[in-house]
Amino acid sequence: MTYEIEKLENDIYVVFEKGKKWRHPAKAITAAFDTETLTYIDGKIKSNRYIFNKLKGCTDNEKRQRLRCDVWAWQCYDEQNGFFMTNNFDTFVTYHALAGYKHVWCYNATFDFAQIDYKILVESKEKWRQHKRKDENSKAYNKSQPWTYESLHNAEGARYSYKLWIPYRDPVNRHKHVHACDYRDFMKILPGGLERLLSELDVEDADGNKIRKLKMDYQNVKVEKLTQDELNYCCNDVKGLYFAIKKFDKTVKEQTGNECSIFGNGTNIMTAGGLAKAELLRSMYPLEKNKRDRVKKYQKDHPVSEAQDKFFRKTYLYRGAICTLNKKYKGKLLTKKLFKRKMNRYDVNSEYPFAMDSIEDLIGKPLTMTMQYYLANKKEYKKDYEVIFLCNHITGFLRDGMIATWYDCRLKEYVETIEEDYRHCIFEDELDEYEKWYDLDYSVEKVILYKKGQYVFRNFVRNNFEKKNKAKRENLVALSKFSKLQLNSSYGKLAERIEKKTGHYEENPETGCVHFVEDETETSTSSMLSVVVGSKITSFARCYILSKIREICGCDKNGKSLVAEKFVYIDTDSIHAFADYNGDAFKLGELKCEAECEAVKYIMPKTYIDIVSIENGIVKSYEIHSKGLATTIVTKKLQQYKKLTLKRIDKIFNYGQKFLTLQAMNVRGGKVLIPVEKYLARPECAEDLYLESGYNGMFLNER
């Protein structure tokens, strides 16, 4: 591609495709944008290694005093106008107003929105101000407010949209206008990284040329003299993102009957969860005209009040998945030689969709009664009602041959001995499953019953499951991603919180950087579905995976469970055990064997290494999981050794081992990635290791 560079006053430059008129762009609706930055330390551009050495031992505020971020490129792309880039934010957004952009997508708003934050909230804070609605309770915008903004985000730092109201003068009639432009994050729909996205979607431009991620040395860019390769890199990123969005939008429209869109005038989707929720409700209420009517119909069928929602959350009815490690094997290198067999890693085929498929809907208002009355009429109620116990006291002791799988919601840990003296709502079916793991005793304050309805999720689940299988057979990547998105993102929206912490971004006067300030908690029931139904789905999934662990591990000839001997690890839908299982791997809800491992080492939940292949004592293939640390960093360390042995892995993949990684930080100018050292697992995490007699801290098979 050939570019033209035009220098403006105040050291501003613009880069655009040759032949395009950037001052009079054609009208477009959708575009893609990105930013490129340089990181300065003490006013100089240095390598990551230099920055790491200089900042070692500094506090975060000391780091912020020495670091600065400079956005040297604000770039965007649309088909009508091609590539545009500038080093000036006002020039950039004015171009968007002239081009009539309504929706501009970035990839990973954590960084791109942070650069906008700094421009608006620090550098130009006298000009920009918070946008005000027409009145306090109105959702309508006041379109005549130039240089205003509105950010949609949550208290955990997730960024969803940034809306800007930008003044501009029509280049033809010279009339003044204010244009509203909405910036969104495509990563909230399809995560995984832009490089992977371009490859997997097989993204092509309008002429059929493939677009793939290019390489650039970020800290060695000479802004005053950009090379052709550097310009190509900048253009390629936004061009690739644009055509990826356009390609995926075609699938979205096809699969939703044109009700949902991420491209063009009809754009109405911001996140994967929002898309999945819209489609789930459409499958349940096909006769209703729109999403709003479907939500109202759902709320009529599932009348959960604000007080009931808060009650069930406060009493822990809604909980997440199980993730725990058999403490007997924590921190030890387990080998095929010791167990005389490989360790198998099984995954449930679409666990949460299977749970949705398996449960009956819970409808109407709840019934409440005493435990005594329920037990006297259990046969009558159990058939037609889902039963919840509100317990005020639960105790339990682990049964012989089992491991701790009961999560104490106050202690926030899995316990072998249960001693709960607080109110805890739990489904009766889940208590029945835990009776097989623990010797339980509990007192019930009251019994809550919900009427069972139809299997309302089956159509949605099975249609998308079949689409996923079809996409796999026919290599339809966009359809595969769409169906997976539907299956994996829908259940969580059923129990979406109605209470949300709010806050705003502002300049921190102490550091000169932008930071987040919490305001208050807002409650909105307008789009609330049912925390009870969402809780039943997660409860069913927990019960199912626990029952599968028992089934896989089996019992000895005396009936004693072998879970404590064979089981290693569970994470949500994944079971790791020295045990065999035969089932239909392609069936919804069945287990499929993802790997057979020669050796494994699990040092913490979500931090482990599975060694798949060993030849003549040399490790040939392995899979790493490392919470809070990119697996590529650990892999790079292991790849330094031409002959990677189990002994070497045992030493490197261990407590107290540090790795150099990149961490996001708000600094003056925006947000940057700075090099820091992080533990794979902190040394104190090894303090509770279960040491068998004779264990020497290295290999179980070398005792």
Where are these regions (language model features)?
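Conserved acidic
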Residues: 2-9, 15, 23-26, 41, ...
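Catalytic phosphate/metal-binding cores of nucleic-acid and nucleotide-processing enzymes, i.e., regions
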Residues: 26, 32-39
